[in-house]
């Protein structure tokens, strides 16, 4: 094959291969203010300390005059061209605090799985990536600063991290054997640590419709790293019924358009169409759009996430409906087979927040009542089993003694209630009737208030 043929073949491979890059952002440079506990670089007369038990490689770019330096047990200071470290004289910078040493922050704080620490060099304005795709995907080329110092924690995910290649310290690793040897060397151990594993050699994405990122299993650890500064909790969405796109850690306000496609669909061309025909319109200026291929129910689809970055205005829903109409009108040209739309609810207002808090309070009250009832039942059961509390059936109760009177003694009258009366003779009959012989057993009592009158009449 001639030179021209090789050039044409290389151009064809470049066209077929849609290489994506992820750039590592943080560093362990001596001249980066965020690497020091006072958020400033050392000034003249400062005493500086490095963590004694941490391995770290630190690049020094400028010249510094310091009064004292405590170095780590295992590490290195790399002096760039023109850089120098010298002992400070008697004078110190008035802006410095000579009483407190300047401490180099923990270099192990940077995790591979933290989306904050990566940047995509191919991200156009108005576009963003869901959280799982902000970390290097399996088809990505990973770039670390060529002329900078860094340290990365691998893990703690369950599976090795797979990428296409890793470029670090002036070398590009695309074979596992070469990368493994580098990670085992002192130079590699100064820059990579942790329980996780890193693998290279994955294939680049050659599918015009896009490729699945491959970080679905790592998403819980990605979200843990992302939300660590927030205490592990997502901020509350500013709308009712928010949406959770696939690959995202927290709910969003906006809309999601799901597209099924045929082999003629081109992901990059569809992204460009969104930017040129829709996002440039004034009513959609405040929207952010993420377009990627995701795996759902063993099938792939194109997920278009529309997020309102400012106050909810309904623009995301409007754009979602516009994309549905565009899919109907131009679906055969774009390679779109079907499209569905999901939208979040209305913006959160004071009344809706009050209703949510009231319903939450009611639910909490109901749960608390159930817990109290369960505790009360448990206490009663324990008391019963210990013999301190007894209960009987109604039929097991002792019968009332038959000899006890059914009435009660009245202290005011202090008289016997039932008293035998003499026989009386009815005027219309010669028959005597004994009152005690009547079935009803009537009785009478002597009222002391009228006892005198009764005796007088007698």
UniProtKB/Swiss-Prot annotation:
GO molecular function terms listed in the Swiss-Prot or TrEMBL record: cargo receptor activity; signaling receptor binding
Positions of glycan attachment: 27, 355
Segments crossing the lipid bilayer: 363-383
Annotated knockout phenotype: Full embryonic lethality at about 10.5 dpc with failure of primitive middle streak assembly and absence of trunk mesoderm formation.
Annotated region described as Interaction with CUBN, given as residue ranges: 67-87
Highest taxon of the lineage: Eukaryota
Domain VWFC: 203-254
Extracellular side: 20-362
Function recorded in the entry: Membrane-bound component of the endocytic receptor formed by AMN and CUBN. Required for normal CUBN glycosylation and trafficking to the cell surface. The complex formed by AMN and CUBN is required for efficient absorption of vitamin B12. Required for normal CUBN-mediated protein transport in the kidney.
Miscellaneous comment: The role of Amn in embryonic development seems to be species specific. In mice, null mutations lead to embryonic lethality. Human mutations give rise to much milder symptoms.
Subunit record text: Interacts (via extracellular region) with CUBN/cubilin. This gives rise to a huge complex containing one AMN chain and three CUBN chains.
Protein name according to UniProt: Protein amnionless
Organism: Mus musculus
Gene this chain is encoded by: Amn
């Amino acid at each position: 094959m001639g030179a021209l043929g090789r050039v044409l073949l290389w151009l064809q491979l470049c066209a077929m291969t849609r290489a994506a890059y992820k750039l590592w952002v943080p560093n362990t440079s001596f001249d980066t203010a965020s690497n020091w506990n006072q958020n400033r670089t050392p000034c003249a007369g400062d005493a500086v300390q490095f963590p004694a038990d941490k391995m770290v490689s630190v690049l020094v770019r400028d010249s510094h005059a310091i009064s004292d330096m405590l170095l780590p047990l295992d590490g290195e200071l790399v002096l760039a061209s023109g850089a120098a470290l010298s002992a400070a004289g008697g004078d110190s910078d008035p802006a410095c605090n000579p009483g407190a040493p300047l401490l180099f922050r923990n270099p192990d704080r940077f995790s591979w799985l933290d989306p904050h620490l990566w940047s995509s060099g191919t991200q156009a304005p108005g576009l963003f990536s869901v959280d799982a795709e902000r970390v290097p995907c399996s088809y990505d080329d990973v770039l670390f600063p060529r002329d900078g110092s860094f340290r990365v924690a691998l893990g703690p995910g369950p599976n090795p991290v797979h990428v296409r290649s890793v470029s670090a310290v002036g070398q590009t690793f695309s074979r596992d054997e070469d990368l493994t040897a580098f990670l085992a060397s002192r130079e590699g151990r100064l820059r990579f640590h942790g329980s996780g594993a890193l693998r290279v050699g994955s294939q680049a994405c050659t599918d015009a419709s896009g490729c699945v990122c491959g970080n679905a299993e790592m998403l819980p650890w990605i979200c843990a790293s992302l939300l660590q500064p927030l205490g592990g909790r997502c901020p509350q969405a500013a709308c009712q019924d928010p949406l959770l796109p696939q690959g995202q850690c927290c709910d969003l306000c906006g809309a999601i358009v799901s597209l099924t496609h045929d082999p003629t669909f081109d992901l990059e061309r569809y992204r460009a169409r969104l930017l040129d025909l829709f996002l440039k319109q004034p009513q959609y200026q405040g929207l952010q759009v993420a377009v990627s291929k995701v795996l759902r129910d063993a099938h792939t689809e194109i997920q278009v996430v529309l997020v309102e970055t400012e106050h909810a205005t309904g623009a995301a829903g409007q754009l979602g409906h516009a994309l549905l109409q565009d899919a109907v009108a131009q679906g055969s040209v774009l390679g779109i087979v079907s499209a569905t739309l999901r939208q979040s609810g209305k913006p959160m207002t004071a009344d809706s927040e009050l209703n949510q808090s009231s319903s939450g309070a009611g639910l909490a009250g109901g749960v608390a009542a159930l817990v109290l009832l369960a505790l009360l039942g448990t206490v009663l059961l324990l008391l019963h089993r210990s013999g301190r509390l007894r209960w009987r059936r109604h039929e097991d109760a002792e019968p009332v003694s038959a000899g006890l009177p059914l009435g009660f003694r009245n202290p005011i009258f202090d008289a016997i209630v039932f008293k035998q009366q003499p026989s009386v003779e009815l005027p219309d009959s010669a028959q005597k009737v004994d009152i005690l012989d009547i079935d009803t057993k009537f009785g009478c009592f002597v009222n002391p208030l009228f006892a005198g009158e009764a005796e007088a009449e007698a």
